[in-house]
Structure formats: C-alpha cells, structure tokens
C-alpha cells in the first residue's frame, strides 16, 4: 500500500514540476534565440509572473486531484489525456485573463510558447513516469477477476490493452462455467472461499465481471465486499453493443435503476460538419506533405507497364459505390494468378473464402510488398477523402460481397464514410478475424467522437512505424 501511496505523490509532484518547468523552459528558449527574454518579459515582472504560474500550477494539480481524481482513480490513457488537454486549455485562458487585466506586460509569443511546451511536456511526463513506476512494480495493482466467462475474458483483454492502468490480473474466481479463452490464459482460477481468501488481500483490486444470468452471484459478491471492508471493488456489467461513449447516465431516486440516454453523434448535422471539416483540412495538408512520396511511388509502380493507381469498387455511405484508390501492388495479370491459385490450392481457397485475403499472396510485386508493409499503398485515398467518398477515420471500406457478413451491423456500416484508417487498422489489422473487424466497425460508428478520431490517427502513426499486422 505504501508503494501505491508514494506513486500518487510522485505523480502529483511531477505534474506540479512539469507545469512550472514549462514556463522556465520557454524563457530559456526565448533567451537562447533572442539573446535574452527582456523584450518579452521585463525583469521587474519576472517574480510576479513566476509566482502567478506557480499558483496556477498548484490550482491545476488540485483540480486533477480533487475534481478529476487522477491520482486516486486509474483511467484509460486516451480518456485521461482528453481530460488533461481540456483542463490545460481552461488554465491557459485563465492565465491569459490574469496577465492581461492587471495590465502586466503581456507577450503572446511567451504565452503561446509556454502553453505549447506544457501541452507537449505534461502528458509525456505522465506516461514516462507511469511507465517507470509500473516497470519498478510501484504502480502495479494486483487484480482479482470475479468471473471466468466471456465477460471476464473481455475485461481482461481491455485491461491488457491499457497497460498504464497498472492492473495486473493475478487470479480469476470462478462462479460457474469457465470459458476456454480464460483457461488458455494460464492464470490461476480459484473456485472456493478458502482458496481465494488465502491468496488475496483486502487492498487488492477486485473486478466483478459476471454474465447476465449470474445476477444473484453478483449481488452476493457485492454484499460480501461491502460488509467486510473491501474498498477497491469495481463492477463491469455486460453492456456489449451499447454506444457507451455517447451515453448520459442518471439515476432514479430510491430505486435501483440506472437510466442510460443514448446519443448517436454521427446522426447530428453539427458532428458530420465537424468531421468533414477535419477531413478537408488534415487531408489537404497530408497531400501537400506527402506529395514527394506520392510522385516517387507513382513512377516506381508504373515501371512494369501497368497503371500506377487503380480504383476498386467499394461500398460507401448510404450504400453508394465509389472507386477506392490505391497504388497497384499486384502484377498486371493478378486476376489470372488468383484464379489459378484458388483452383489448385485448397488451403489458399479456404483462407480467401474466410477473410478475402491471402497472407502469402503470389500476386504482389516486389515494390508492392514494400508499400503494403508500410501502408503507403493507401496514400491515394487522400483524394477520396477530399472528394467526400471517404473519411480519414472510419469503418474499413468493403466490397459489396462482404455486406452480408455484417448481418445486423450492416446499418452501422452504411451510416458512415469508410475510413483510410480505423479501429481495425490500429487493433491488429490482418491478424484479427473477420467477426472482430465487423465488431470494431460497428463500435466506431456507435461511439463516434472527434476525440476518438484524433486518438485513432495517432495510434495509426504508431502502427505504421512498427508495421504491425500488415502484409
């Protein structure tokens, strides 16, 4: 417990120091490039400005601690990052008002540089320190999973995908049936009161992740934890399929009823305009930045005599067909090569019928293998984005034959423009099965937000650089 307490103190001190270091670092940068900072901050005001910034740092850290509970509750990385940026924006505007109204000397350059460094340094420092604390074992929390079914397995995977939470699942406690997925994890599974009380502590994190038909067991566990002094208990009900990101929650007084107000953000005109604006602005900038790469690949692919770019029919928003642009990565006679392979190789035919992809595809050219591995074959889709046929982020563009495989989720797919990248691309790409791809596409549409798009774009950069799941 002491280690966890000191981890909280370390995070608190780090945030306070980072906040102040950003101001001092901005003064250093200005001094280095402008032979002193007096032009941007008079010497007689430096003490006042340092004091103001230090007070703001204390208030900001207090806000993180008391209102947002960043040092007591553990939150998923992207959710916490959104709260950090939102808070820093508020405090940046607040400092602007404090400095401007008392008629202190105000430099927009110093203000912008200070907060620009803060926005960069603050989350980076959080990640690095959490990474260090987890690696040293100080921030790790032994976690006991109540349940051993599909819900418990889903929760385990979610925790594994959020390493900075520091939850380390050490045991499962079985209530009824044990799923094969849980068995394959090789994590101890306990099934009696005496067995789990002897290996756990009241300070451990307990997560109740039972199935819908185990409501009685769930209530019994909650009653036991509440009456026996267990404080770190979380309940994760089975809510698969609900649009949780856009849900407002309220409670009925004196009733054990929770009201979830569902909101479909992509159905709002304002949300669609916002998403389209980001597509146009970011897409245009990307074309300008990557224009040398586009030109080089165009001529490199064209060397074998075929077209460098081809358009393949895909299903877009509202079922409208469009030509999805890509650099050609296959031989000119790729159709004949595929037909012959499927006719003579039963294993390849089975793989193709399952996922419409081949891991060892003989149609791919040498330059094609490179640009596929680096995902550069999809760069021409930036023009699809500008035309309004695609979005930077969205469901994976599919052919018409794949629509039937979406079954009841097909309406979600048709609600949004297909994306150059999406949850599928940042979650394993070709290494995941088709049903999981469908799940990711429907989850994205149901839970859309501009912040999710930004998070997926940053995740895509990491995937492309590491070449995860591409072939």
Swiss-Prot record:
- Domain of life, per UniProt, equals Bacteria
- Does Transferase show up as a keyword for this record? yes
Transmembrane domains' residue ranges = 10-30, 46-66, 87-107, 280-300
Instruction: Give a GO biological-process term.
Output: polysaccharide biosynthetic process
GO CC terms for this protein? plasma membrane
Could you list this entry's UniProt keywords, alphabetically sorted: Cell membrane, Exopolysaccharide synthesis, Membrane, Transferase, Transmembrane, Transmembrane helix
As for subcellular location, the record says: Cell membrane
- Its EC number(s): 2.-.-.-
Q: Copy the pathway line from the protein's UniProt record.
A: Glycan metabolism; exopolysaccharide biosynthesis
- UniProt xrefs under InterPro entries: Bact_transf (IPR003362), EPS_sugar_tfrase (IPR017475), Undecaprenyl-P_galact_Ptfrase (IPR017472)
Stored Pfam families: Bac_transf
Question: Membrane topology for this entry?
Answer: Multi-pass membrane protein
Among the GO molecular function terms of this UniProt record, one is: phosphotransferase activity, for other substituted phosphate groups
Describe the family membership recorded for this protein in Swiss-Prot or TrEMBL. Answer: Belongs to the bacterial sugar transferase family.
> Any idea what job this protein has?
May function as a sugar transferase.
Protein known as: Uncharacterized sugar transferase HI_0872
């Amino acid at each position: 417990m002491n280690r966890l307490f000191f981890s909280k103190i370390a995070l608190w001190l780090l945030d306070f120091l980072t906040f102040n270091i950003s101001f001092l670092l901005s003064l250093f940068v200005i001094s280095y490039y402008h032979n002193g900072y007096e032009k941007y901050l008079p010497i007689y005001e430096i003490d006042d400005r340092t004091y103001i910034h230090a007070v703001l740092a204390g208030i900001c850290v207090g806000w993180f601690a008391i209102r947002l509970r960043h040092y007591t509750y553990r939150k998923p990385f992207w959710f916490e990052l959104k709260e950090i940026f939102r808070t820093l924006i508020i405090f940046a505007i607040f400092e602007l008002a404090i400095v401007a109204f008392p008629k202190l000397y105000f430099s927009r350059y110093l203000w912008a540089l200070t907060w620009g460094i803060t926005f960069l340094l603050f989350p980076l420092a959080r990640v690095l320190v959490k990474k260090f604390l987890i690696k040293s074992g100080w921030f790790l929390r032994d976690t006991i999973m109540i349940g051993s079914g599909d819900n418990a397995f889903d929760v385990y995977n979610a925790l594994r995908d959020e390493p900075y939470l520091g939850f380390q699942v050490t045991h499962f406690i079985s209530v009824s049936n044990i799923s094969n997925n849980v068995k394959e994890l090789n994590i101890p599974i306990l099934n009696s009161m005496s067995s789990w009380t002897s290996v756990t502590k009241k300070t451990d994190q307990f997560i109740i992740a039972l199935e819908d038909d185990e409501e009685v067991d769930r209530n019994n566990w909650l009653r036991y934890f509440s009456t026996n002094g267990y404080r770190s208990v979380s309940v994760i009900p089975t809510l698969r399929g609900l649009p949780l990101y856009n849900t407002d929650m309220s409670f009925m007084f004196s009733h054990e009823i929770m009201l979830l107000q569902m909101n479909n953000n992509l159905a709002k005109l304002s949300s669609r305009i916002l998403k389209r604006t980001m597509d146009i602005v970011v897409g245009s900038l990307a074309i300008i930045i990557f224009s040398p790469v586009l030109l080089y690949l165009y001529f490199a692919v064209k060397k074998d005599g075929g077209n460098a770019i081809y358009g393949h029919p895909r299903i877009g928003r509202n079922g409208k067909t469009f030509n999805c642009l890509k650099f050609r990565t296959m031989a000119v006679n790729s159709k004949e090569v595929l037909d012959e392979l499927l006719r003579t190789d039963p294993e390849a035919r089975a793989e193709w019928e399952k996922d419409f992809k081949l891991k060892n595809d003989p149609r791919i050219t040498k330059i094609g293998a490179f640009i596929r591995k680096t995902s550069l074959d999809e760069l021409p889709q930036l023009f699809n984005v500008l035309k309004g046929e695609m979005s930077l982020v969205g469901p994976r563009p599919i052919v018409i034959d794949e629509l039937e495989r979406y079954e009841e989720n097909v309406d979600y797919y048709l609600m949004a423009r297909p994306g150059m990248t999406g949850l599928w691309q940042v979650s394993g790409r070709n290494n995941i099965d088709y049903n999981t791809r469908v799940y990711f596409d429907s989850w994205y549409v149901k839970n859309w937000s501009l912040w999710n798009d930004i998070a997926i774009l940053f995740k895509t950069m990491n995937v492309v650089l590491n070449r995860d799941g591409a072939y």
